[in-house]
């Protein structure tokens, strides 16, 4: 009901259609929308989860509108194999390739819009949690906000098996088969790397305690890693999903 009656007119802004390539990869074009409301303001890269409509998901559009209303610039784009961006595989790689897309977005903002390192933040929702790998690799990303994010790839397979009523011991073979289909090991990189080298860069975690698909254990493990490294982490865990 809230979506049916929600007035979006206050959150509609002029945007620029943009395109760029992943860092270190040519031949793949990523496409998105850039909104600049203040040339002196910082910018946030938005990272979507599933399904395939990517940046067009209602929560992505609303987030971009909220950021603009608050005077913050934003870049929302489709990861590879989503939306209007190029397709390079029949399978997603749960962040193992996609983190390079985020680094490409960062590079584009630095080179084309003249942002300085530290002026670029990043948000990620659900399966977009692989963005944390980009945060781990690029110290110029000044802050990270994760909402119900997948931060442990083997764990999310285990979560899904349990949700569907299958034995959790299939998780290991599932990860291996998924990597074979995607053409990359799904455990080669981990979003948890970001908790090890965040330093004093702020990280905000929010998660539903009863999330039926991405268990709160993802965020809690990330939080524990950050605390053990004396990092700057803030959490908001809600009772309902």
Predicted features, each with a name:
Residues 41-49:
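Short beta-strand element of the alpha/beta-hydrolase
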Residues 198-199, 204-207, 211:
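Short beta-strand/loop motif that positions the catalytic acidic residue
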Residues 2-39:
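N-terminal cap/lid segment of alpha/beta-hydrolase-fold proteins
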Residues 92-113:
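Alpha/beta-hydrolase active-site loop
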Residues 191, 215-225:
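Short alpha-helix in the alpha/beta-hydrolase fold that links the catalytic acid
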């Amino acid at each position: 009901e809230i979506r049916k009656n929600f007035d979006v007119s206050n959150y509609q802004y002029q945007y620029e259609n943009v395109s760029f390539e992943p860092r270190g990869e040519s031949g793949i074009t990523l496409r998105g929308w850039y909104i600049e409301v203040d040339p002196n303001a910082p910018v946030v890269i938005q990272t979507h989860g599933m399904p395939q409509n990517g940046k067009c998901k209602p929560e992505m559009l609303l987030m971009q509108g909220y950021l603009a209303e608050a005077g913050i610039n934003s870049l929302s784009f489709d990861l590879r194999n989503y939306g209007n961006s190029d397709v390079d595989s029949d399978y997603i790689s749960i962040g193992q390739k996609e983190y390079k897309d985020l680094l490409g977005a960062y590079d584009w903002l630095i080179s084309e819009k003249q942002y300085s390192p530290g002026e670029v933040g990043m948000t990620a929702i659900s399966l977009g949690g692989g963005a944390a790998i980009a945060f781990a690799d690029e110290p110029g990303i000044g802050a990270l906000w994760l909402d119900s994010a997948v931060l442990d790839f083997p764990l999310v397979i285990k979560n899904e098996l349990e949700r569907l009523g299958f034995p959790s011991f299939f998780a290991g073979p599932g990860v291996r088969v998924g990597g074979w289909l995607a053409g990359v090991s799904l455990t080669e990189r981990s979003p948890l790397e970001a908790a090890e080298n965040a330093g004093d860069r702020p990280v905000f975690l929010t998660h539903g305690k009863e999330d039926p698909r991405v268990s709160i254990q993802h965020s809690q493990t990330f939080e524990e890693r950050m605390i053990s490294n004396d990092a700057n982490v803030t959490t908001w865990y809600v009772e309902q999903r």
